[in-house]
Regions:
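Periplasmic OmpA-like peptidoglycan-binding domain that tethers envelope proteins to the cell wall
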Residues: 98-175
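Periplasmic peptidoglycan-binding/tethering modules of Gram-negative envelope proteins
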Residues: 1-91, 156, 171-175
Length: 175
């Protein structure tokens, strides 16, 4: 059972507006090359490094400059939980990314805290963090501002796509 501190109702207008603000206002039809929505990944029969990855806008999951998950993150997290439950042998790598504002050290810590918040939510909601053979299946990585996807010359709104959490998948034995 998925635990939640919030009522089961999500305001659809708030969720949709937050989704649009997520990765630079992009919906599923404008995902970057190689990126797939969690819904698209759920439709695949198996996952591995050739499956692509999912990019979740940090503005959808977290308040600006924070690592506490927003209520509107619930749908994305439930989709990720479902994906993990459907693929118990798949290894998941959760990467936290930030924009270029703040020091490198601060951004590294913030991105780690965000990736760990995703990990902790999954753990708190009963998602197995180990594969059936007992090996780890969820890793977190802090990327800070080291891997921007849009120019770092812009203001806070222009860099929204750089604030993200990426979910990468691997089959056991894949590098």
């Amino acid at each position: 059972t998925i635990k939640t501190a919030e009522p089961d109702m999500v305001n659809p207008d708030e969720w949709y507006n937050n989704k649009l603000k997520g990765a630079g206002g992009q919906d599923d039809s404008h995902l970057p090359d190689g990126s797939k929505s969690l819904s698209q990944l759920m439709a695949q029969s198996s996952l591995g490094k050739d499956s692509g990855y999912s990019r979740l806008g940090a503005d959808l999951l977290f308040e600006y400059n924070k690592a506490v998950m927003k209520n509107s993150a619930r749908l994305s997290m439930l989709q990720l939980a479902g994906l993990m439950m459907k693929n118990p042998d798949t290894i998941f790598i959760v990467e936290g990314h930030t924009d270029s504002f703040g020091s490198e050290e601060y951004n590294a810590v913030l991105s780690l805290m965000r990736a760990n918040a995703v990990r902790q939510w999954l753990k708190d909601n009963g998602i197995a963090l180990t594969r059936p053979n007992g090996e780890c299946r969820l890793y977190i990585r802090a990327c800070g501002s080291s891997r921007p996807v849009v120019s770092i010359r812009g203001d806070r709104d222009a860099q929204a796509a750089n604030r993200r959490v990426e979910i990468h998948m691997r089959k056991p034995g894949e590098e």
